[in-house]
Amino acid sequence: MMEKHYVGSEIGQLRSVMLHRPNLSLKRLTPSNCQELLFDDVLSVERAGEEHDIFANTLRQQGIEVLLLTDLLTQTLDIPEAKSWLLETQISDYRLGPTFATDVRTWLAEMSHRDLARHLSGGLTYSEIPASIKNMVVDTHDINDFIMKPLPNHLFTRDTSCWIYNGVSINPMAKPARQRETNNLRAIYRWHPQFAGGEFIKYFGDENINYDHATLEGGDVLVIGRGAVLIGMSERTTPQGVEFLAQALFKHRQAERVIAVELPKHRSCMHLDTVMTHIDIDTFSVYPEVVRPDVNCWTLTPDGHGGLKRTQESTLLHAIEKALGIDQVRLITTGGDAFEAEREQWNDANNVLTLRPGVVVGYERNIWTNEKYDKAGITVLPIPGDELGRGRGGARCMSCPLHRDGI
């Protein structure tokens, strides 16, 4: 059955969301490979899974539909064309050589779709293939080397695709460790019965090509509503990516303006939503560094000829106030003294998921910031994050809204 897919804001009633429960991919994380796979530490996978279940159930108890990425991927593999396409793109002849790649694809094609989905996100080692598959490539690798690397960052479903008004951007990811995630989402949006044939726009990123420097990640994209989109230019999202998305939004008349803000290029400010989220009509949670007066900010609008008009803004807050038609933005800054605020920002105190105006989900460990939310009239539904938080992502990072009301 075709579902409605529309995201009209950051704060309207959330109705449907895609999550990814930690699985095999996190079990593959080790101290020697976690940096390459963009994690700072290894997690207790069982405990992270329990924490994620509490997160998912918190959403369900609020009447929100929760779809799990592994389920969607498993169901997508029931479509022969989708299965063939995924095997061809994820098991590349150019990576493994044509004969070995063919043998691996043939073997994978025979397993259950649940197991295949598990490997498409969790990776595959040489030790897991049958001894009957013989090849020079096998002979020259250690049994614990990866044929297909794991995708532990699938946990952060926000980044790989983002719904903006009546369409979706299927994002070309900046780091090699995440680029294969996009193919899993391309397949789901092309072939899964929930999405196939749906009347939604694919703004950007659906083609399996090299996007070079035009990278974009959903953690940098805030659909602030009223025809406006706020995008952070971070260590992951480039001005080139912003321009492609803005042009598509204007071409399809889905947005009237895109506000682009330059972010510091460091790990603690990986995406805009690690330092800023929209939690009520006039209220944002922020780490103060991002709203300094000297931060570069532009508003992009259509130039009337298929291009972009760029206007330098005096401040980010002024640009947001104009876009939303409000007199003054209310800011709730990260709580505690300077040391506590830095610690809580690192632990995703600002990375909350708004369920409806003034109601958010966030990690219970951020006691100083949660206290500030409470005093400001914002209700926090707390979830544990001692293990999940080690991945440097909070409730917003771990969720991809599929249906949300406008404002």
From Swiss-Prot:
Domain of life the protein comes from: Bacteria
Pathway: Amino-acid degradation; L-arginine degradation via ADI pathway; carbamoyl phosphate from L-arginine: step 1/2
EC number(s) recorded for this UniProt protein: 3.5.3.6
GO CC annotation: cytoplasm
Catalytic activity field: L-arginine + H2O = L-citrulline + NH4(+)
Keywords of the record: Arginine metabolism, Cytoplasm, Hydrolase
One BP annotation, GO: arginine catabolic process to ornithine
Transmembrane intervals: none
Active site: C397 (amidino-cysteine intermediate)
Keyword Cytoplasm: yes
Subcellular location, record wording: Cytoplasm
PANTHER family: ARGININE DEIMINASE
Membership in a protein family: Belongs to the arginine deiminase family.
This protein's name: Arginine deiminase
Gene (name only): arcA
